[in-house]
Amino acid sequence: MRKLSLVLVCGFLVSWGFLAHKTLQQLAIYPLPSDLGLFFYANQDYIVEQSIRPDVRRKDDKTEDSKHYLDMDAAVFGPNYRTDIPHDFKQAVAKYSFDSLRKEGLVPLEVNRVYARLVHAFKNEMRDSVLFYAADLGHYVADAHVPLHTTKNHDGQLTNQKGMHVLWESLVPEAQLKNYTLFYPKVPEYIAKPQDFIFQILLESHAMLPEMFKAETEVRKALGEEKSFKMVERYGKTQRYYTDEFIQAFGDKLGTSIPNRMIQSSHRVSSFWYSAWKDAGSPTWVTKDISLEKKAAFEAEKVQWRSNSLISTGKLISLHKK
């Protein structure tokens, strides 16, 4: 398992990751069909705030860490890992063993497990369980969109680029979020085979790795070591972090790569929620006890979402001060 991930969760770095998860979870609500979207909007504060719960669990649950990634290039999967890893979990266990899969990552299993529980909760009108599993599912699906969740070189530690993980998924979004276009014009799509689709997402993420590592090398070379890094005192230790100048330059070097992946992630989260609702028979109980005022507020906020003004109007919950 990844001890680094536990360090990030317990320390200062994870708070930046929280921003991205909360933002993506909120954005996933707006494109949903009106009835389902209204249900999630009525419970928006919970959905957004609990989007980070799987990361928080890492502190106390030793089984949690491996649920957030799949190191596709691990030796156990062989050179043809892009095509050879079975999507069916039982077949994967038979081929590699459960211990090997747990070591290299279980995010496909966790997505499918939580998805099935969400479908069950929708079918049986288990309101609280729907919200619980929807929040968790959104987190795991979003994590699968992060390239560094698909490789043994998950923090650049194998290529002398340590710190890449938090740089890509946290520091750049935190620095540049206000410049992002948060509206995505596509409606949620029904996912007929979630088990296969999550592997498609992971392969997309994995294909982004070369560009990321190359960009880090080029920006560091252009700025020089002194402008690329700073020494910071954290928890009684002096540690090296990327400078603000480097973070901006790296984000600029990648162009729309990070914001596009973030918005694509929110669309896929929305699609997983929608598909679970459809697989449960599109239950109508989701519209129970929702006021006319809440419906009007949802429609008004969707207008702000479409005009990319959630930040300027103060509606993006992840930016609210506690």
PLM feature spans:
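Catalytic Zn2+-binding segment of zinc metalloproteases
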Residues: 141-156
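N-terminal, motif-rich segments that launch catalysis or mediate targeting to/interaction with membranes
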Residues: 15-132, 136, 152-235, 241-245, ...
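Sec-dependent N-terminal signal peptides
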Residues: 4-13
